[in-house]
Amino acid sequence: MKPIGVQLYSLRNLAEKDFPGVLKKVADIGYKLVEPAGLWNVRPSEFRKMLDDLGLDMVSSHTPWARSSASLGEVMEIAHILKLDKVVCGYMPANFATLDDIKRTAEDTAKMQEILERNGFTLFQHNHDFEFARIDGKLKYEIFREYCPKVKIQLDCFWSTNLGKEDPVEMMKIFSKEIISIHMKDGICKQDVSGTKMVNGILERPVDLMPLGTGSLPIKDLVANMPESAEAIIVELDYCIIDMLTAIEQSYTYMVSNGLAAGNK
């Protein structure tokens, strides 16, 4: 079984008030891993020590976020302090709007990838729903991959449905060779999403989500078809219809008690 982690963006409102306390609660639930998206005014070295003290680890981070070749020096330095060999990139809907946009985005990504590779880092792409829209019947993400064939993917299974238009298991199979980890959220896949914006450098797409196992995402089928290359299953609930800490604990219990992921308890 793959280890289970939680994307700390899910707990951002609590982290703003008591970041060390949030990390302790995550460890107490039994999560093996965390994936940060911001360090809440904690130095990278201090954050790394906090994880070590709590017996937590991470295989990836959404901090720092690779946005251009010009920022990669700082990005690599932070990743090194965090003891990571992977760096994340991701985009706005406008970056995938047209064929020309996709090509330009892929070319920029390939440039960053080349620099990172020379320095011992792997670049991975985190998706939302819009990459799984189609142009002339072809997935935009497939077009992106053609122009940037070396890129690795952190597949967000819920978003890969493109709001209920695609089969997430089929999407996983299509990109199985590129997948390095999985983001798992749950909810009613077919819903409208509006109000997209950037908040503290992170793409925010308001969506109604639920604890894992209570929505319409075929989680058991996804885990059964997960490629060996996936290092971890990371729970991420951008929003939730119930208290977030409760949802994170319920999601952990669902995954571990059903033998879908490995935790510490």
Stretches with model-predicted labels:
Residues 203, 208, 215-224, 231-236:
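H/E-rich (His + Asp/Glu) clusters that bind or coordinate divalent metals
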Residues 47-63, 112, 116, 142-149, ...:
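Alpha-helix-loop-beta-strand connector modules within alpha/beta enzyme cores
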Residues 20-21, 71-74, 101-110, 137-142, ...:
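Charged helix-capping and loop-helix junction motifs
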Residues 118-216:
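Acidic/histidine-rich catalytic cores of soluble enzymes
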Residues 1-86, 152, 253-265:
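N-terminal pre-domain/capping segments
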Residues 70-108:
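Glycine/small-residue-rich loop that forms an oxyanion/phosphate-binding "nest" at active or ligand-binding sites
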Residues 12-17, 33-46, 63-71, 94-103, ...:
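Acidic-and-aromatic substrate-binding clefts and catalytic sites of carbohydrate-active enzymes
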Residues 5, 35, 60, 88, ...:
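Conserved beta-strand positions in the central sheet of alpha/beta enzyme cores
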